[in-house]
Structures are given as structure tokens and as C-alpha cells.
Amino acid sequence: MSFRSIVRDVRDGFGSLSRRSFEVTLASLYGLTGHHKGKTQSSLDELDDSPAIIPESRWASLPPELLREVIRRLEADESTWPSRRNVVCFAAVCRTWREMCKETVLSPEFCGKLTFPVSIKQPGPRDGMIQCYIKRNRSKSTYHLYLCLSNVVTAEGGKFVLAAKRHRKTTCTEYTISMVSGNISRSSRTNIGKLRSNFLGTKFIIYDTQPPYNGAVVPHVGRTSKRFNSTKVSPKVPSVTYNIAQVSYELNVLGTRGPRRMRCMMHSIPASSVEPGGIVPGQPEQIVPRALEDSFRSTTSFSQSFRSTTSFSKSIMDPSMDFSSARFSDISGSIMGGDDNGEIKERPLVLRNKPPRWHEQLQCWCLNFRGRVTIASVKNFQLVAAPSPPPAGAPTPSQPGPADPEKVILQFGKVARDMFTMDYRYPLSAFQAFAICLSSFDTKLACE
């Protein structure tokens, strides 16, 4: 029997589950979400006291040596989507098969592939880039991220990865990032993060539902302040968001003829990650999706992060998020933080846009996207690691810098009217790269 037929049999085996078992499972899901609907709920209530008996698959008792060989060959043969869904089906059979998959299927940092949902929160490959593209829907204000399945930059039909929806407000713009392609709302339980801008569209904060590693210099955590009569959020799953990055744009002296000047301060990624032997600590093992409809009403996250817009010459953020009118060199030199015990925490990674070069023949400013961008646009950019200055008061030994200071970590560019390529690599994740690229779509009133 071939390995594909084994996977096919396993996938078909899911259909043998009894309707009773399915309804019991569905009842537990309804109990978690708190959504109830008429007759369906009444029939489910009758099954609440019954134990969920789900028949074990006949493949669950296979010898570990055989399972390991099956997943090893499956991982090697089904390396691209859509056939890679067979690897996901393998992991969905039972706990034993899932644990076997964890041992064999590596994270994107080492295999360069997006397989399971948690892959979108894990760093990209160290060697090479993961190629994606973003489709913009102007009428619905939505943005969809797809994994490229072809080398043709304008080819569609890729594997869906993430989606975002823009919400314009009086003083800011918000982008809700979701794991589903349709029905994106702030109250959805499939949201994994958010992007918020200031009034001018020059400063952005990336929020994540995933907590960062302990050593990160992260500003205040935003906890929701729910209305007293709200019953949508379970007390077991609080709406908590973490400020993991800040994106800032500065006045572009080239106007619309050159790329925007931007910097990204990645609070959840240490600067040492791009040094030889560096790592990104605290990588998640599972996705933590949450509803975000009220996650920005906290006094610590909202009122301190984005103050009144009556005076733009002053800082619009609290001291830990100070972007005020300081220049980028001042910002990068003041991001060393510490905890209440005086312990110095690790400096976050800072990314800057790669400056363009003047092309004498074309008489324009150019960046080398290696064929991945075909249309000139002010939105196009390439990000590289900015040099990290030594901590204040510390001795100045020869500290290792980035292995390759000019290595492009993230590039984004236009290939059609509403289609843009997005290529990223270690230490950024797909979620972080997507959020940074979303900031490029927003109007920059003070930069152009």
C-alpha cells in the first residue's frame, strides 16, 4: 500500500465518526463560544451529560518505527501546497501521530515551509526567503496574504495564509489580522493581532495575542476593559494584546520618486538574533486567537499609547513608546529597557529601509528586488537590520554585528494594480512581515 493511499484512508476515516460523537464535540464548542441557536442548542443540551465516545482510528496503533518512516517520506514527497495538506491530515489523526509530526516536521526557520497554523508566528528561513503576495480589495478594505506557488510574480491561486481588514476611525486607522479569509471582524475568535496607526499615518503599533519572551523590552500590556453588561468574552480567555513592534515613517526628501524612510522596532525580537549564532527566543508552540473588539480600551494601551491628537509636535505615546519628533538615530539609541529590579533587558532588533541607488540610464532611484517587483511605487521597500549601538556605560569591545548588514530581511513591492509581493526571512515571521507591509498601504499625510 502506498503512503498516499494510507493518508487517503486516514482522511476518509474521519467520516466514520458517529453523528452522536460529532454533536457532542459540537456541543462543547458551543459551550466555549457561548453562541446558541434554537433547536440545535436544545438537541445539544440533551447530550451534555453523555460522555464523548469517539472511536479510535485503526491506524493509531501502528508501530512507532513505521509511523516515523511514513511521516519522513510524506514530509519529503509532499513539500509544496496543495499536496502538503496530506502532512496536516497525518497530524490530525490522533495524539500519537501528532507528536510524531512534531518530531519530524521542522519549523520554517529550518525547513523553509509553512505547514501548520503556528508556522505563521514562527521565524522564516535563515537561508532563502518565503515568497508571498498580498491581494488588495479596495471596495471591501481587505487584504489577503497568500503563499506563492509559482515563480511568476503575477500568478494567482496561492495558498491562503492571513487576511486583514481596515477600520477607519476619527483619529486613527486599525487593521484587524485574522486567520480566516472571510467575515473579518474585531469580535471574531480567529483574530491573532492588530495594527494601529496615529492620525497622520506615520506611526504604527503592532499588537499580538501571543505573549513575547521574558527578556523582551515590551511596553505596557493592553488588557480589555469590558462593559459590565457584556457577555461575549469568557473569563477563561481574557482579551490581552501585546505591543510587539513599532513602525515609524519619516519625511521622504525624494517625495514620491523614492521609497519611504521607515524604521521598525521589533520589541519581541532581540538584536542579537541577527548576529552569528543568534536565536529568536520564546517561539510559540500554538496559536492564541482572540476577539479584539474591546482590547484597545485599556487605559494603559490606549490612552497612554495614543494621546490626544491636538498637538502633534509633542509625543503621542508614553515614554516607553516615544516616537515624538526625535530622529531615528535617537530612537535606536534609547530603546534599552530594564525591569523593576534594575535588570537590563536585551536590546530589541531595529530594521531600517535600504536606501535606493540612482540609476543613470533610467534617471530614477532604484532598488534591486531581483525580479520580484515590476511596478515603481512609493510603497515599495526593502528592510535590513540597523546597526546596534553598544549599551550606555558599557565597555566597547568588538561586539559582533549582523552577519550580513545588507541582507534583505523583508521586501515588499507592487506587481499589479492591487497585487503586491511580500518576501520575508529570519528573524521575522509571516504575521510580523504582513503587519509591517499593511502599514505601507496607509496614507502618509506628513511624509510625501
From Swiss-Prot:
Residues 56-102 form the F-box domain. It holds the Pfam family Tub. Residues 387-406 are annotated as: Disordered. SUPFAM superfamilies: F-box domain, Tubby C-terminal domain-like. InterPro entries: F-box-like_dom_sf (IPR036047), F-box_dom (IPR001810), Tubby-like_C (IPR025659), Tubby_C (IPR000007), Tubby_C_CS (IPR018066). Residues 387-403 have a biased composition (Pro residues). Expressed in roots, leaves, flowers and seeds. Coiled coil: none annotated. Belongs to the TUB family. This is Tubby-like F-box protein 3. It comes from Oryza sativa subsp. japonica.
